Amino acid sequence: MMQAVESRDRGRGSVRRRVIAVLALTGAVLAWAAQPASSLTGTATITAGSLGFVSAPGNVSFAATLNGTDQTITQTQPIDVSDATGSGTGWNLTATSTTFTAGAKTLSTSATTLTGAPTDACDAGSTCTLATNAITYPYTLPAGATAPTATKLFNAAANTGLGNQTITPSWKLSVPASTQAGTYTSTWTLSLVSGP
């Protein structure tokens, strides 16, 4: 009989302890929920890069066979530009050249032209802002015995042209029927200049 009473007493004590534990836990949850909100500051430091060519523009090679008629030869030239400045000031692609010569033979100083605007596309892996180009075409590549002052052949207006993008002009070389045969060479200079 005594053992049964003790067992019941122990059972009641266990229940009481569980009730007390539940109440204590509930109080802790209420205390945690009542804590005031905390604010913090997130910082992202973005360092400016530079304006330049991703890789040096490649050579442009024209080829034609004289056939007694005036000819126009077309050749494309991908130009990979990187504007990592983060400034949004825009940029200009300028060009100049020396006259095509083969010994004493020369082509016209207006032989090389662009009849339309170059194409422009973001490079793979670059979420770029395509350049807004304001150059009027056709464009004639400046040429002379000594390269004259460079002129703009393509540009990016303010807040455009950010990231890496490839500009592809389709150059046209005029070869009159009276052109003498030979291998003509010309030195071209392409430059990137900051500003709209």
Residue ranges and their predicted role:
Residues 3-36:
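Secretory targeting and sorting signals
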Residues 34-196:
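Signature of Gram-negative chaperone-usher
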Residues 2-8, 80, 117:
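Exposed, low-complexity/repetitive linear segments and helix-based recognition motifs
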